[in-house]
Amino acid sequence: RVAGEDPGRGRGVSEDVSGWTYVGTRAELLPGEFKVVYDEVTQEPIAIYNIDGDLYAVQDLCTHDGGDLAGGEVHGFEVECPRHGARFDLRTGEAMCPPAYEPIAKFPVREAHGGIWTRDDRE
């Protein structure tokens, strides 16, 4: 299931995924795993995490020094930057501890046409 999404939403309706980036299938993103994709429009890296069956998509960029977050340890709902140990909440993007103080962007995730999709929805 997608975090924060009504599980009955969109049933029986063909959902438009234009402007969305294909991530993969549930079988390719099991609980405890993550995957990085590049937004089809902005080319920004997005990290998608499966935490106990819920999907979260965030900017794959530490706001402390610009390093990749993907590959850092996950503690509950927090990802730890592998470079300097800053932590970010995957549910909100909030910076949880120094050396980062600015949040990371959080992106929508949806399931449609048998796959997982995300997009950089920043203006």
State what each model feature region is.
Residues 87:
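Short helix-to-coil "ATP-lid" hinge immediately C-terminal to the conserved N-box Asn in the Bergerat
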Residues 62, 81-84:
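Short cysteine clusters
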Residues 9-76, 90, 103-123:
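N-terminal pre-ligand scaffold of iron-sulfur
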Residues 76-82, 95-104:
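Short cysteine/histidine-rich metal-coordination sites, predominantly Zn2+-binding motifs
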